[in-house]
């Protein structure tokens, strides 16, 4: 047991017993922890423990069992995100993906900063779909998946119209397409963008602009990567997929009018 003060982001909360809450917080100093909040629905902590809120938490952290929030300060919420069902759905997925990417108790200040900054940029109005793609690609290594989208796996040449090979877990240049007859047949812009996404800085994020058709191609291929290399199936991701389908149907109906 230790007393600790740390910045943290609420990943989720759920009811526990009749009036209490269990709250998963990703903290900068102590990693992900599950906290017990007595009277969570009506106590002084009720506002701050809502998903995606960020604050400085004064905590009692236990290595085994539940931890406890003693107090908090500097609470921040993302009003633009929580008022938009699409942004909220994508942000919720990022929180769930973060929860899946590292074990509880593992300190990962870099991932914490990346999640926080991604949420801030989403709140500021940057493209939430592309921000999500970038997050998905950069968090792959937390699942033990390290893919090189920069060069051909055979000749290491760069800057060519590459395709992806699951057989070799990497890119093929035109001279080596024949090495895998079941290569992905991607639009070459997909691996080009994924290469950029892997090393993109936060400031560069502001200049990224991707057309809808390319977004669909990115979404399809990243889904395939996660199916083949990660194998997780998050409810929040399924909700996004359904939401996008509904959105496309609504868009078609609006155009028909």
Curated annotation (Swiss-Prot):
Keywords: DNA damage, DNA recombination, DNA repair. Pfam families: RecO_C, RecO_N. The keyword DNA repair applies. GO terms for biological process: DNA recombination; double-strand break repair. GO terms for cellular component: bacterial nucleoid. Involved in DNA repair and RecF pathway recombination. Belongs to the RecO family. HAMAP family: RecO (MF_00201). This is DNA repair protein RecO. It comes from Streptococcus thermophilus (strain ATCC BAA-491 / LMD-9).
